[in-house]
C-alpha cells in the first residue's frame, strides 16, 4: 500500500535493526485518513471471505481493525491484555509474548462475542515473531470460529512471524512488508506484480 509505505518512509523512525517506531501515525498519534485507507484496503482484500467479526489486540490494533470493521460492516472485538472488572467469566484466553515490551501477558476475549458461527479476520498493527497473531488464532480456535486470515498493517519480513502463520495454514495479507531495518534505513520487500 503506497500511502502506508510513504508514511513509514517519511515519519517512521528506525530505532535499531529490529525496531521501527511509528508512533507519529499508528501507535500513539493516529492518522485517521491513513487508518480509513487501511480499513478500505483490508475490506477489499477480504470482501469475498464471509467475514462476520474482526478480532485484534489492544491497543494499537484497534484503529485499523475498527476502520476495516466499518468498511466490511462487521463488529470488532479486541482482546484485552489487562484484567478488567467487567471481563471475568466465560473467557477465551491465550498467553502472548510481546516482542517490543519483552513481557508475557494473558490476552482475553469473552466467549459471548466470539463463537462457532463466526468467520474472523484477525488484524494487528505489526507482525514480527507472530506471537500476538498466534494468540489471537488460539482464541478463535477455542471459540471454534473460522479464521479467514490475517490483516497486518506492517510486517517485519525478516522475522519469522509470516512463515510461522503460513506454515500453520493461514492466509497473511500485509499492507507494508519490511525486508530490513539495517543502517537506520527502511527497505521494503519488492512485491512481484502478476
Curated annotation (Swiss-Prot):
It catalyses: XMP + diphosphate = xanthine + 5-phospho-alpha-D-ribose 1-diphosphate. Its EC number is 2.4.2.22. Gene3D superfamilies: 3.40.50.2020. It comes from the Bacteria. It is found in: Cytoplasm. GO terms for cellular component: cytoplasm. SUPFAM superfamilies: PRTase-like (SSF53271). 5-phospho-alpha-D-ribose 1-diphosphate binds at residues 128-132. InterPro entries: PRibTrfase_dom (IPR000836), PRTase-like (IPR029057), Pur/Pyrimidine_PRTase (IPR050118), Xanthine_PRibTrfase (IPR010079). It is an enzyme of class 2 (transferase). One of its GO terms (molecular function) is xanthine phosphoribosyltransferase activity. Keywords: Cytoplasm, Glycosyltransferase, Purine salvage, Transferase. CDD domains: PRTases_typeI. Transmembrane segments: none annotated. Pathway: Purine metabolism; XMP biosynthesis via salvage pathway; XMP from xanthine: step 1/1. One of its GO terms (biological process) is purine ribonucleoside salvage. Xanthine binds at residues 20, 27, 156. Homodimer. Belongs to the purine/pyrimidine phosphoribosyltransferase family. Xpt subfamily. Converts the preformed base xanthine, a product of nucleic acid breakdown, to xanthosine 5'-monophosphate (XMP), so it can be reused for RNA or DNA synthesis. This is Xanthine phosphoribosyltransferase. It comes from Bacillus pumilus (strain SAFR-032).
Amino acid at each position: 500500500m503506497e500511502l502506508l509505505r510513504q508514511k513509514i518512509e517519511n515519519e517512521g523512525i528506525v530505532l535499531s535493526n529490529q525496531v521501527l517506531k511509528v508512533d507519529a501515525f499508528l501507535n500513539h498519534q493516529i492518522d485517521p485518513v491513513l487508518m480509513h485507507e487501511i480499513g478500505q484496503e483490508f475490506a477489499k482484500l477480504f470482501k469475498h471471505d464471509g467475514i462476520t467479526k474482526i478480532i485484534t489486540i489492544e491497543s494499537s490494533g484497534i484503529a485499523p481493525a475498527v476502520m476495516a470493521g466499518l468498511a466490511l460492516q462487521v463488529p470488532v472485538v479486541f482482546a484485552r491484555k489487562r484484567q478488567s472488572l467487567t471481563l471475568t467469566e466465560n473467557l477465551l484466553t491465550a498467553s502472548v509474548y510481546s516482542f517490543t515490551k519483552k513481557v508475557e501477558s494473558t490476552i482475553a476475549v469473552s466467549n459471548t462475542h466470539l463463537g462457532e458461527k463466526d468467520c474472523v479476520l484477525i488484524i494487528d498493527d505489526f507482525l514480527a515473531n507472530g506471537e500476538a497473531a498466534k494468540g489471537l488464532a488460539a482464541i478463535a480456535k477455542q471459540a471454534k470460529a473460522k479464521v479467514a486470515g490475517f490483516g497486518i498493517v506492517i510486517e517485519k519480513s525478516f522475522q519469522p512471524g509470516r512463515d510461522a502463520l503460513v506454515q500453520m495454514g493461514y492466509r497473511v495479507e500485509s499492507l507494508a512488508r519490511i525486508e530490513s531495518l539495517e543502517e537506520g534505513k527502511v527497505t521494503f520487500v519488492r512485491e512481484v506484480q502478476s
